[in-house]
Amino acid sequence: NGIERVEEDLMGKERPGIYDPYISVYCIEAGAKLLQREHFDIMYLTTTDFVQHKYAPGSVEANDFLSKIDYWLGELDKLGAIIGVTADHGMEAKTNADGTPKVRFIEDLLNQQCIPSRVILPITDPYVVHHGALGGYGTLYLEDQSQLTAAKAYLQGLDGIETVLTNDEAVTRFELPSDRIGDLVVLADASTTIGRTPSWHDLDKVKEGLRSHGGEYCQVVPMIFNKKLKQDYDDRLVSGTCRNFDLFHFLSNGF
């Protein structure tokens, strides 16, 4: 973005690591200091969800983190910025009664039924300390298309699996591109995650508890503004029909 020497000239301090809860605070603080230095028509500040993965709402750690985010949002407000805050997903605890991660390794389970498949987990990214590549959504490709009905019925009967959709059903229900999803789409319940095989995941990263997202229980997200919206936009906001990608439209036209 053409911004150089952030640590040396803008912030005067070292950037936190990716697994430091305060890397997100650093980002919002940097945005405020940039706006102090020069004018921008639009600023997009994106944070990590490390704290939300590791600490439940109301915990000391979560409250401390959010209070610091709130402070720097307040500094942006003082500078005259119109601020919109949203998220790409919610977050839920995904654990058994003993606190261990609750996982259904569906590729392994299907193999045990002589139904070979390849499971794709969209949550997979380099940041396995966050979530161990475990979330509530998975899609899979079958080696043998004639096993589609049997695979769907088997998965639907598993504890912790709430919904199993064919490609066509998932396209219609979730507005997904047909060529980017597999033969089946699998959604877990609120407290369960979907994995591939036990050997594919490093559960040591989440052995002290797992909070993650995916499925249909993490769809509701906040949309917060620091200025009063026009009445028609306010009506739309409280109607419950907005999507998080509507944020830019609201910021551009709603005041």
Regions found by a protein language model. Give the residues of each.
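His/Asp/Glu-rich, glycine-adjacent segments
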Residues: 1-56, 136, 147-150, 156-163, ...
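Acidic, His- and aromatic-enriched active-site or binding-groove loops in soluble protein domains
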Residues: 1-9, 63-71, 102-122
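Structural motif
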Residues: 42-46, 84, 185, 224
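Short catalytic/ligand-binding loop motif for oxyanion handling, primarily in non-cytosolic enzymes
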Residues: 51-55, 92-95, 99-100, 194-196
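Short acidic, glycine/proline-rich loop/turn micro-motifs
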Residues: 54-59, 234-236
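Metal-dependent active-site segment of extracytoplasmic phospho-/sulfohydrolases and closely related
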Residues: 64-108, 186
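A conserved active-site cap/scaffold subdomain adjacent to cofactor or substrate pockets
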Residues: 91-116, 125-141
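Active-site neighborhoods of enzymes that stabilize oxyanions during catalysis
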Residues: 123-255
